[in-house]
A protein has these predicted regions:
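Interaction-mediating elements
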Residues: 1-122
């Protein structure tokens, strides 16, 4: 059960924000084999001047960064996460986000750190 936060400039149209969320979810499904219904996302539109990214870090050419933070249970190996990063980036690129503008960070924890609601069972 990942908890995904997507941070984008508030100039991105609402429909496009939801398309980004769809692309991220599809990337998790493709890259990690998660169920498509295992979807918990928060979209944060921010003023463009509140999104800071070095435009040339690691030789990049960043202009309109989309930050994707994924909080998930530690259960995937590095290869699976690499597949997920690639799938998310490809999905966002299909929605018009340049690969240099995709920034994904994963934080992992254990099942003991989650409460999935009163009826949730692991």
């Amino acid at each position: 059960m990942p908890l995904v936060t997507i941070e984008v400039a508030d100039t991105v149209p609402v429909a496009k924000r939801f398309a980004y969320a769809e692309a991220v979810n599809a990337g998790l499904v493709e890259g990690l084999g998660m169920d498509a219904e295992d979807r918990f996302q928060v979209i944060h539109p921010l003023p463009a001047d509140h999104i800071v990214a070095d435009p040339h870090y690691l030789g990049g050419d960043r202009r309109d960064v989309v930050y994707v933070r994924i909080l998930m249970v530690r259960m995937y190996d590095a290869e699976s996460k690499a597949r997920m990063f690639d799938a998310v980036a490809r999905g966002l690129e299909a929605e018009g986000v340049r690969p240099d503008d995709v920034f994904i960070a994963v934080t992992e924890n254990t099942l003991d750190d989650w409460y999935p609601g009163a009826r949730g069972e692991w």
